[in-house]
Amino acid sequence: MSSFAKRIIPCLDVDNGRVVKGVNFVGLRDAGDPVEVAKRYNSEGADEITFLDITASHENRGTIVDIVKKVAQEVFIPLTVGGGIRKLEDIYSLLNVGCDKVSINSSAVTNPNLINESSKRFGSQCIVVAIDVKRVADGSYHVFVKGGREDTGLDALSWAKEVYDRGAGEILLTSMDTDGAKTGFELNITRQVSNLVDIPVIASGGAGSMEHIKEAFENGASAALAASIFHFKEIDIMDLKKYLRANNIPVRI
C-alpha cells in the first residue's frame, strides 16, 4: 500500500451540460450547473473531481468541452472526464481546455491500442482506464461494458495487467455488483488489482459510509470515488478526511 496521500474523488454525471442524479446541497444556487457543484467540492476539500459525460447523442458532445473550459477557470483541483471518448482527437480537445485526465472505458476494450497511443502522445499520467467488473458464476471477475450490460468475457485481472502494460496511468475500478448499493466496495477485487499493477487504483461502486472508504484504502486503493454520499451530504468530505487521518490513513487536509 503506497504511503502517498489517499485521494477523495466525487463523481458527477453530466447529461447535455447538466449535472444529473440530483445534487442536494443547501445554498447551492443551481445544483444542475457543473461549475457551481465543482466549486462547492473544491471548497469542501475534494482532491479531484470526475465528470462522467452520459450524453447519449454524439452531436451534443461539444457541451462537455465547454463545461470543462468553464470549470477549469474556477476550480484548481484536477479534473477527469470520462464517457464517450473514442479517439485521440476527443482526448486532445478535453486536455486542451483544462481537463487534467481522461477516463476511457469501452473504447479501450474495443481498441486497446488507444491506451498505447494516448499515453505515448499525452503522457500516461493523463490516461485513466475505467474497468467495470462483475463476479461471474465460477467466482472470477469479468470486464463488462455498455454500463454493465454486456459481458466481454475478459478476465478482469488479465485486462488490468494488460491495461497497465499498455501504459495507463491509473485504473478506475468499478464493481457493478456493489455500485449504488452503499454496502461497501468489493474489497476482494480492489485488493487483487492493486497488488497486480504498479499504478494507482481508484475504488468505485458501493461507498455508503466513512468506514467503507477506509476499508478501500486498507485494501490497496489509492483513491476512492463516490457520487450520492457526497452529493446528498450524507458524508462531508472534511469530516471524512479527519476520520481517515484518525485511522492512520494519509490524506491532505
Curated annotation (Swiss-Prot):
One Pfam family from the record: His_biosynth
Pathway(s) annotated for this protein in UniProt: Amino-acid biosynthesis; L-histidine biosynthesis; L-histidine from 5-phospho-alpha-D-ribose 1-diphosphate: step 5/9
Gene3D superfamilies, A to Z: Aldolase class I
SUPFAM superfamilies from the UniProt entry: Ribulose-phoshate binding barrel
Major subcellular location class: cytoplasm
Keyword Amino-acid biosynthesis: yes
GO biological process annotation, one example: L-histidine biosynthetic process
Reactions that this protein is recorded to catalyse: 5-[(5-phospho-1-deoxy-D-ribulos-1-ylimino)methylamino]-1-(5-phospho-beta-D-ribosyl)imidazole-4-carboxamide + L-glutamine = D-erythro-1-(imidazol-4-yl)glycerol 3-phosphate + 5-amino-1-(5-phospho-beta-D-ribosyl)imidazole-4-carboxamide + L-glutamate + H(+)
Disulfide bonds listed in the record: none
Subunit structure: Heterodimer of HisH and HisF.
Family: Belongs to the HisA/HisF family.
Entry protein name: Imidazole glycerol phosphate synthase subunit HisF
Organism whose genome encodes this protein: Aliarcobacter butzleri (strain RM4018) (Arcobacter butzleri)
